[in-house]
Amino acid sequence: MKLVIKNGHVMDPASGRDEVTDIWVEDKRIIGFGEHPEWEEDAEKLNADGCIAAPGLVDVHVHFRDPGFTYKEDLETGSRAAAAGGFTTVVCMANTKPIVDTPEVIQDILKRAENLPIHVKQVSAVSKGFEGKELVDFQAMVDAGAC
């Protein structure tokens, strides 16, 4: 599928791009910027006048409260809110119930996050039960997917 996003304010610090231009997308990948008249007939068009187009944002400190406090927020509602705000990746804190201090809890969270609209990362607690007495097995936590 071809898509042209018209007149978006493209802001990309990595490339130094900061301009209002068209964005050309094919099969969900950006393939170019500017005018491509040969595409105009075949491409779906999206008017982005007045909108900013930027790389996805990353929030390195979120509290989705899942597991344990899902009446406040859960992986689904938190990820949808993050996506609506332009975030494509979030890093969840470990102060849940149970506390994220075992590989099994990490694996459970990451498994449930697989089909969400954003990338969900999970940090590990430093000590078991947040008690500051015994360290978690950091290698096991990393092997389970903790960041």
Give short role names for the model-derived ranges:
Residues 19, 38, 71-75, 104-107, ...:
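Short, glycine/charged-enriched secondary-structure capping and boundary segments
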Residues 12, 61, 94:
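Residues that line or immediately flank small-molecule/substrate-binding pockets and catalytic motifs
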Residues 11, 65, 127:
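Active-site beta-alpha loop architecture of Rossmann-like, nucleotide-cofactor-dependent enzymes
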Residues 79-147:
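Divalent-metal coordination cores built from histidine and acidic residues
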